[in-house]
Amino acid sequence: ILKSLRTSLLLMVMVLSCSCSNEENSAPHKGATLPIMQGIADNVPYIQSVEKEAAYDLHEGIHITDVTFTYCAHPTRMLIAEIDLTKNVTIAVSTPDNKPEVGILKQQVKVQAEKAEASGRKVLLGTNGDYYSQSKTDDTWIPGGLVYKDGVALWTKLGWEADHAFYLLDDGTAHITPVEEFNAVKDHVRDALSGWQRLLIDGQLAGKFTVNDNAMQFHPRTFVGV
């Protein structure tokens, strides 16, 4: 059973700074050959060309796509994990030392994976989850929003813009909703983390996001979808 560290289906890594080119790539789908990447390349104008693609099954129910492309004139790598929750895998929230608490210790995802496996869980894939910040009054680490683990609410204070939640219910189904809808079913939530802006709602763009290649810095980001 997969016990994923901080839930994610999509990991996008970008280099700092961005200077986009207006040059058009004449290759079909900007060079993408995999269907999932063709759809992304066709709908993201800031992707200029796709250089390398690889796809493989990490485990039954977990399909990985590893892509290198040019985004705003800079090399970018993106990892996509498609997880089939109808197979013998699931997604779970992790915490430092695999304990039912947050805010006490800052710990790398790799170490959290080792701690989870030491407790009997088989970890196949892990990534970072929500934001956190250091308390201004004591040496603790404050989650950016909701944290539920194994049916227990570990953190319920909502941080700045943490107005959505990704969560799994007791029946194993995954959902992304505004916090108000989450609150209506929170008694049946198994694992949950908060999130910021939604890119898509029911397959439609949720809003307009501006990329200013002269002023913005780009950082590694994690996205999740259902």
Show where each model-derived region lies.
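Zymogen propeptides
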Residues: 21-159, 164-165, 173-176
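Glycine-rich, charged/polar anion/phosphate-binding loops
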Residues: 65-67, 162, 185, 207-211, ...
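Extended C-terminal subregions enriched in glycine
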Residues: 168, 174, 205, 209-226
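C-terminal motif of bacterial Sec signal peptides marking the signal peptidase cleavage site
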Residues: 16-19
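Short gly/pro-enriched beta-turn/loop segments at secondary-structure junctions
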Residues: 160-161, 169, 191-194, 216-220
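Short, conserved active-site entrance elements at the starts or edges of catalytic domains
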Residues: 187-210
